[in-house]
Amino acid sequence: MAKDKFVRTVLGDVPAESIGITDCHDHLIKNGGPEMHEHPDFLMIDVEAAKKEVQEYVDHGGKTIVTMDPPNVGRDVYRMLEIAEAFKGKANIVMSTGFHKAAFYDKYSSWLACVPTDDIVKMMVAEVEEGMDEYNYNGPVVKRSKAKAGIIKAGTGYAAIDRLELKALEVAARTSITTGCPILVHTQLGTMALEVAQHLIGFGANPRKIQLSHLNKNPDRYYYEKIIKETGVTICFDGPDRVKYYPDSLLADHIKYLVDKGLQKHITLSLDAGRILYQRNYGLTKGKETFGLSYLFERFIPLLKQVGVSQEAIDDILINNPREILAFDEPRVYDASKVSSEVVQLKKDLKLL
């Protein structure tokens, strides 16, 4: 990796080789938004609890946390900057721009629905290159923070890609092309992941800068293998400590399978601890004993070793892959004429053209 490769944190760009053990998809502060309609546990605004959680992560050897809260879906630039400043020189915080799944946006009046794609791309590029809007593009005022986004989020729903989600995927791909910023996509219960990868690449995104999340909720190792081999993207397994979906042993076995197939360069890990009772220190504020970010080190990494995943592969998954994937690419010029014919036809079918 070239020495000038960098990862964009909220406190500035850092050398990619310095980011250390990285949690590639997590949450520390979630300041309201549509997720709260699903469960009140999605409201996470306790800065002190979040700081304690980061400290435990650091104490276990963690160095970088990528927080995947896009504008209007929990993102809080003020509080996240406070946390980042508290750990300056000890831990890196990366924040996101972009969108979540279409269910979180009004299909008629949201700016994702109303604003032309070209203009939304400009808005996202500004968040990466100039600074995130402290008001989350709620309008009519835009106030740029000193903190810039270091990753682009998109999202898709269960077993279908909504027309607004395809629009958000195009925005993500074009923003990534223009800025070099990496992409991570929420795939609901791990569905439509292959199609998501194909569409992003069809728009021109670099597959090495794409991560797909929540595939662990669709426990099919052959599906994972197919996605990686056919598209070259990376799967971010974000679900240790989710026994309601599957035991940790199943996820560990799936990772071992992929490693044995020579695909360890296409795996990253995280906790996706985006609810109060998914973090130890938030749980304590509710009078509950729960697990937290330290679970990765105390329980899941030992399990990976137990099932036979080598230390070399673990180092790739936790350190080497994130620093390559999260490092900004060389910016390119978006060329609409090079978009795949399949994506162009899908845009026509979904009346996006």
Curated annotation (Swiss-Prot):
The UniProt record lists the keyword Zinc: yes
Positions of Zn(2+) 2 binding: 153, 186, 214
CC cofactor: Zn(2+)
EC identifiers of the protein: 3.1.1.104, 3.1.1.25
A Pfam family annotated for this UniProt entry: PTE
GO biological process per UniProt: catabolic process
The reaction(s) this protein catalyses: a 1,4-lactone + H2O = a 4-hydroxyacid + H(+); D-xylono-1,4-lactone 5-phosphate + H2O = 5-phospho-D-xylonate + H(+); L-arabino-1,4-lactone 5-phosphate + H2O = 5-phospho-L-arabinonate + H(+)
One Gene Ontology MF term: zinc ion binding
Binding site for Zn(2+) 1: 25, 27, 153, 272
Disulphide linkage map: none
Keyword Hydrolase: yes
Stretches assigned to coiled coil: none
Cofactor-binding details, from the entry: Binds 2 Zn(2+) ions per subunit.
InterPro entries: Metal_Hydrolase, PhFuoseLconase, Phosphotriesterase
Class in the EC hierarchy, top level: hydrolase
Residues the record lists as binding substrate: 244-245, 275-278
UniProt keyword terms in alphabetical order: Hydrolase, Metal-binding, Zinc
Residues modified to N6-carboxylysine: 153
PANTHER family: PHOSPHOTRIESTERASE-RELATED (PTHR10819), PHOSPHOTRIESTERASE-RELATED PROTEIN (PTHR10819:SF3)
Function: Catalyzes the hydrolysis of D-xylono-1,4-lactone-5-phosphate and L-arabino-1,4-lactone-5-phosphate. Also able to hydrolyze carboxy 1,4-lactones.
Similarity annotation: Belongs to the metallo-dependent hydrolases superfamily. Phosphotriesterase family.
Protein name: Phospho-furanose lactonase
Species: Mycoplasmopsis agalactiae (strain NCTC 10123 / CIP 59.7 / PG2) (Mycoplasma agalactiae)
